[in-house]
């Protein structure tokens, strides 16, 4: 599940310590980011392209 997130969207907790590997030949590391109600500032160098977004931890578990 990958959601389109605009740069002005600030309700993101960046939890990129967690990573998943896709089952491809390259096996790129994918950052995991959670969406919550708390407003957290996002730095200008935040790369949304590398993130998979989940509404909750339960959604993350269901997707694995």
Curated annotation (Swiss-Prot):
Swiss-Prot/TrEMBL keywords: Mitochondrion
Subcellular location: Mitochondrion
GO cellular component: mitochondrion
Predominant cellular place of this UniProt entry's protein: mitochondrion
Domain of life from the UniProt record: Eukaryota
Name the UniProt record assigns to this protein: Uncharacterized mitochondrial protein ymf25
Organism in which the protein naturally occurs: Marchantia polymorpha (Common liverwort)
């Amino acid at each position: 599940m990958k959601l389109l997130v605009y740069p002005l969207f600030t309700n993101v907790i960046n939890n990129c310590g967690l990573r998943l590997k896709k089952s491809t030949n390259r096996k790129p590391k994918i950052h995991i980011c959670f969406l919550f109600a708390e407003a957290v500032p996002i730095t200008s160098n935040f790369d949304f392209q590398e993130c998979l977004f989940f509404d909750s931890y339960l959604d993350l578990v269901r997707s694995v």
